Amino acid sequence: MSGGAVAFLLLVAAAAVANAAVTYDHRSLTINGQRRILISGSIHYPRSTPEMWPDLIQKAKDGGLDVIQTYVFWNGHEPVQGQYYFSDRYDLVRFVKLVKQAGLYVNLRIGPYVCAEWNYGGFPVWLKYVPGISFRTDNGPFKAAMQTFVEKIVSMMKSEGLFEWQGGPIILAQVENEYGPMESVMGSGAKSYVDWAAKMAVATNAGVPWIMCKQDDAPDPVINTCNGFYCDDFTPNSKNKPSMWTEAWSGWFTAFGGTVPQRPVEDLAFAVARFIQKGGSFINYYMYHGGTNFDRTAGGPFIATSYDYDAPIDEYGLLRQPKWGHLTNLHKAIKQAETALVAGDPTVQNIGNYEKAYVFRSSSGDCAAFLSNFHTSAAARVAFNGRRYDLPAWSISVLPDCRTAVYNTATVTAASSPAKMNPAGGFTWQSYGEATNSLDETAFTKDGLVEQLSMTWDKSDYLWYTTYVNIDSGEQFLKSGQWPQLTVYSAGHSVQVFVNGQYFGNAYGGYDGPKLTYSGYVKMWQGSNKISILSSAVGLPNVGTHYETWNIGVLGPVTLSGLNEGKRDLSKQKWTYQIGLKGEKLGVHSVSGSSSVEWGGAAGKQPVTWHRAYFNAPAGGAPVALDLGSMGKGQAWVNGHLIGRYWSYKASGNCGGCSYAGTYSEKKCQANCGDASQRWYHVPRSWLNPSGNLVVLLEEFGGDLSGVTLMTRTT
């Protein structure tokens, strides 16, 4: 090949890359030289299985989405420092390639802080114990670890050819996450940290725009974006940046002990149309499919295993109707108006006391209008462009040609199809009692009480605190029968108390306050008495400041009252610690480890007990769940897969009526008051065999096995 031919080919290649570059101006992102209105939806790859991904992505595409948005979960990818994991549910490359195959784009939110109601906000716990570390500030050890991970992800995406300029689907990347509200409390290092993070991200040469959400001072060229229930009042920090909404909350998360929030689709559609009519050009539904907090990935603490989020695609991968259908129709209407929308900024006309018209025109004559009625109860008839239009309360009509109203946010024409849970069989149980008063060779003794996470490193939810109390023969309670009172103060999240192997009760915190106090009378005898406290975590916090200072477990004081001496403080005496449960170490929840212990008949409502049963997969292809509403608190496995924590914690809240009209918040439309926050637990079909499936429950409090049922979900 001649030198001239080579030069020509290089020029063609360079031109192709330049043409494919993702850029932006004040109006929108530009892809392949064209301004775009982009509709996006969050699907987090670890919250579903690889077998579910193609169907979820296709349903998103069918729903009118252009982009799939996902966080990158650091603690899933680097659970041990320097040891990386990118397989199974954490196969990020596979997920991104599936999005490409579907013809959609990707917004990759690398963070690496994610929040997301995810354990420890996505940070690996080992990071807390890096010497000298201070999280999310101008701190050398933290910045070094963060940069290593961000650069690794960018390098991996480049090597796989996954950025848009390489022919891949990634058009955006995000660094940090919702840091703006934290700056004022993070002190002088906050602003320099933000500037460093932005500069570090841009220096990776990812070749796509970087964003920071809820970051009003994001430095150029990083785009600051909005998160919230509504973002139509949001303005970027530069006239050269487009208005982007990275989290349009489609619902809200559920916490154990909390209600199930639901967001009416009429209001969600209204919020999106409000944003578009005010000049917004990128909107992402958080979540479009929420999925499941499998394993122990739920954060909070006290975040439920279900991350359904009232999303258009439900936790099980089924369409939530009419939400999915009504939003799909909205997206079609917006796309019909796209040419006019991207041409420039709207002009605004007052067409009533509460009504306005936002009109977009292109130089070629295209015209689109959004007619809005902000009254929360009264419909309106308005005049626009020589015609009259009826606008329901709290609604927007979309006119892609400035004449024909093809869509109204409050007029739902999509068919409703409520989901049903169908019984598919019961279980025959066997039980194995966890040893509550024995320690093995891994136990260790220290003076005083020690913080839980510093010992478990989150390898287990559980830590035994054990100490001994000597009771003299002269103690008055031995004669009176008025037993002493044990009081335990804990930073969270749940404790169970045993004395001499006998169970005396439990105490636990809640989402609004993880700290707890146990206080109860305990039976003791003359001589040495063994006090065993099982402390359990219910997810690590996912939002806040100074992660390096957070703690859980029994921090004290622990006191014993009602003795001749009055109150005895046990906090500073010797305590013996045992990380995890015996059954965990033996792997009784796994298919191979289940045979390592001797199982007996089904036990009654006993605390800290393992239960197992075998079952056949239900016929057909409908999603599968376990009904654990009759159980107490614990963890559940199927064929060795931890489907998550379960807890029949009764929901408290206000489950009154719900109108779509008026400003929405997560407290407005609630369900499940008085019932368990979560009753059904998703069991992915890909985890099942046709027959001989093993289900194992670790029950902490003592539940009713007779109520546990296999279910299928249909619409």
UniProtKB/Swiss-Prot annotation:
GO molecular function annotation: beta-galactosidase activity
Enzyme class, UniProt record, top EC level: hydrolase
Annotated Pfam families: BetaGal_gal-bd, GHD, Glyco_hydro_35
Keywords: Apoplast, Glycosidase, Hydrolase, Secreted, Signal
InterPro entries xrefs: BetaGal_gal-bd, Galactose-bd-like_sf, GHD, Gly_Hdrlase_35_cat, Glyco_hydro_35_CS, Glycoside_Hdrlase_35, Glycoside_hydrolase_SF
EC identifiers of the protein: 3.2.1.23
Subcellular location: Secreted, Extracellular space, Apoplast
Gene Ontology biological-process entries: galactose catabolic process; plant-type cell wall modification
Signal sequence range: 1-20
Keyword Cell membrane carried by entry: no
Active site location: 178, 247
The family this protein is said to belong to: Belongs to the glycosyl hydrolase 35 family.
Name of the protein this chain belongs to: Beta-galactosidase 9
Native source species: Oryza sativa subsp. japonica (Rice)
